From Swiss-Prot:
GO-annotated biological processes: cell wall organization; pectin catabolic process
Descriptive protein name: Endopolygalacturonase II
Pfam short name (any one): Glyco_hydro_28
PbH1 repeats: 156-186, 238-259, 267-289, 301-322
PANTHER family linked: ENDOPOLYGALACTURONASE B, POLYGALACTURONASE
SUPFAM superfamilies: Pectin lyase-like
InterPro entries the record matches: Glyco_hydro_28, Glycosyl_hydrlase_28, PbH1, Pectin_lyas_fold, Pectin_lyase_fold/virulence
GO MF annotations in UniProt: polygalacturonase activity
Length: 362
């Protein structure tokens, strides 16, 4: 039998353990059925379940400032009432956050209500998800349908997005435009693993950042796997990017690097590896340094350097009216490239390529 003294000692030890517990251990699991309740109660929860939430018009599902270690689960169908505004529909920040989707869940943006074929012009359309300051965190297994405009805006360090499905296929016939899947900027350490995307703009667009890995992606119907446009922003450096083991089909481009005319910056340590393309309407591989006001001018400048670029096992076919490969560099600004097993066929050969390293073919 335990003595009173030993029981007292045990109780004091337990109290000390509780007193020293981290905040997340003291918090509980919460289920929210409204966006307002989630915003008001998020700080007191170690696990947040978002249960069939209908987000009011013009309102962000605000999960910013989450306590470190919080788990977020999307359950049922998440919907958003209609208003013409900039968004985002969802915003999340914090450290060591784990975001998942429960079995059978759907985040249905019903973007057709906004689509008018004009993208960032025309009706004001909300962006979908801001992962700004969502550091050392993960987003896994989300099923997303019909974003009004861009899907994920990533500005975070050490973030991993895995098994994300973005199905904007309806936008092909209903006026979806500028529905980028993953826009990455001002980030260090971004991993995007096994995404499935059907959209009407870039599957991946990296405007700035370092240590970025995109692997095992399926990209359908958009503008391909892009770096840029680089230049003209507060951060104009893209470094150490690997894009690999992915397919790009029925898209405008497959592999693309573009920089802004007259700007400064750098693109370096870039690898595209094991990329398979089909049904490409514009360019299989395009690297150009002539963008101005969002459009190519045909007049490249050399203020943004593109160095240490490796293309290996980049293969597939483009449409007969498309161009296999187009390389337009400024004087001396493209260097130290490696090309190995780059085989793009089916389209035209460009006669306008300029200033590209001799190891490449155009």
């Amino acid at each position: 039998m335990h003595s009173f003294a030993s029981l007292l000692a045990y109780g004091l030890a337990a109290s000390a353990t509780l007193a020293s517990a981290s905040p997340i251990e003291a918090r509980g699991s919460c289920t929210f059925k409204t966006a307002a309740a989630a915003k008001a109660g998020k700080a007191g929860c170690s696990t947040i379940t978002l249960d069939n939430i209908e987000v009011p018009a013009g309102t962000t599902l605000d999960l910013t400032g989450l306590t470190s270690g919080t788990k977020v689960i999307f359950e049922g169908t998440t919907t958003f009432d209609y208003e013409e505004w900039a968004g985002p529909l969802i915003s999340m920040s914090g450290k060591d956050i784990t975001v998942t989707g429960a079995s059978g869940h759907l985040i249905n943006c019903d973007g057709a209500r906004w689509w008018d074929g004009k993208g960032t012009s025309g009706k004001k359309k909300p962006k979908f998800f801001y992962a700004h300051g969502l550091d050392s965190s993960s987003i896994t297994g989300l099923n997303i349908k019909n974003t009004p405009l861009m899907a994920f805006s990533v500005q975070a360090d050490d973030i991993t997005l895995t098994d994300i499905t973005i199905n904007n296929a309806d936008g092909d016939t209903l006026g979806g435009h500028n529905t980028d899947a993953f826009d990455v900027g001002n980030s260090v350490g971004v991993n995007i693993i096994k995404p499935w995307v059907h959209n009407q703009d870039d599957c991946l667009a990296i405007n700035s950042g370092e240590n970025i890995w995109f692997t095992s992606g399926t990209c359908i119907g958009g503008h391909g796997l892009s770096i840029g446009s680089v230049g003209g922003r507060s951060n104009n450096v893209v470094k150490n990017v690997t894009i690999e083991h992915s397919t790009v089909s029925n898209s405008e481009n497959a592999v693309r690097i573009k920089t802004v005319s007259g700007a400064t910056g750098s693109v370096s340590e870039i690898t595209y590896s094991n990329i398979v393309m089909s049904g490409i309407s514009d360019y299989g591989v395009v690297i150009q340094q002539d963008y101005e006001d969002g459009k190519p001018t045909g007049k490249p400048t050399n203020g943004v350097t593109i160095t240490d670029v490796k293309l290996e096992s980049v293969t597939g076919t483009v449409d007969s009216k498309a161009t296999d490969i187009y390389l337009l560099c400024g004087s001396g600004s493209c260097s130290d490239w490696t090309w190995d097993d780059v085989k793009v066929t089916g389209g035209k050969k460009s006669t306008a390529c300029k200033n590209y390293p001799s190891v490449a073919s155009c």
